[in-house]
Design a protein with these regions (language model features):
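Membrane-helix interface "capping/anchor" motifs
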Residues: 102-110, 161-174
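N-terminal signal-anchor transmembrane alpha helix
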Residues: 13-57
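Aromatic-anchored segments of alpha-helical transmembrane domains
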Residues: 38-44, 118-127, 177-192
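N-terminal TM1-TM2 helical hairpin plus the immediately adjacent luminal interfacial "cap"
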Residues: 45-107
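Hydrophobic, membrane-inserted alpha-helices
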Residues: 74, 92-99, 153-161, 176-186
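Aromatic-enriched alpha-helical transmembrane segments of multi-pass intramembrane proteins
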Residues: 22-37, 70-72, 148, 168-188
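Membrane-interface micro-motifs in multi-pass membrane enzymes
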Residues: 141-162, 196
Length: 219
């Protein structure tokens, strides 16, 4: 009887794992790439660059001054760097939202949803705060001049797109639950954060409806 070599047995045990990992990487390249980049940045800002985080926020974060001056080139970076140093909760939400969207709509649309919903949210939130500040809101006046950045709005935008693309009544239930959560979040999040999340979700719903129409038109 021939006894298989130990190395051969170990290689056979590793092969399904390696094959499975490669399969996941091929199926969800955008989700894995963005999550990896954001986590690495989070680790770096929480350790090596922790003392420089405020300077990074001032240079990259989006606020009224950035909008007025047309400093939009920093917006992509602002989507990837968090407003607080270190690892944050929405990094998990990103995987839970972006992964299903990439599966349902494809990698390109997942990438576009991630960035576009955040960019639309950044501009609309700043304009909303500016309008509220003009109406006498002291909170809005303070926040509209406070630089902000992060990927939580992008994650919620992707989640809203996924909810919109669900079949039948599931979409209505999911969107209703998301709307209740976002409305209630104004009681525990700052006005700018809650507004940004709501705006991103709105952009995600619009994108989700477009993708539903596109999918239906293709069948």
């Amino acid at each position: 009887m021939t006894v298989p070599a130990v190395g051969t047995q170990e290689a056979k045990r590793r092969t399904p794992f390696v094959g499975g990992a490669l399969g996941v990487a091929r199926a969800f390249p955008v989700t894995l790439a963005l999550t990896t980049v954001i986590v690495i940045i989070g680790v770096l800002t929480g350790t090596v660059f922790r003392a420089d985080h405020q300077s990074i926020l001032d240079a990259v974060g989006f606020d009224l001054e950035a909008l007025k001056s047309g400093r939009l080139w920093t917006v992509p970076a602002a989507t990837l760097i968090q407003a607080q140093p270190g690892i944050k909760w929405h990094m998990v939400l990103l995987v839970l939202a972006l992964g299903p969207l990439e599966y349902m709509a494809g990698s390109l649309w997942a990438l576009l949803a991630f960035f576009l919903t955040d960019w639309v949210s950044s501009i609309l939130t700043t304009l909303t705060l500016w309008a509220l500040a003009g109406m006498g809101s002291g909170t809005a006046e303070r926040l509209v001049h406070t630089p902000d950045m992060g990927s939580s709005a992008a994650a919620l935008g992707a989640l809203a797109a996924v909810a919109t693309m669900l079949p039948g009544g599931l979409a209505a239930v999911a969107l209703g639950g998301l709307l209740v959560f976002l409305g209630a979040s104004f009681t525990w999040w700052e006005l700018d954060v809650a507004t940004a999340h709501l705006m991103a979700a709105g952009a995600g719903v619009a994108l989700g409806w477009f993708l539903r129409w596109r999918r239906k038109a293709a069948t």
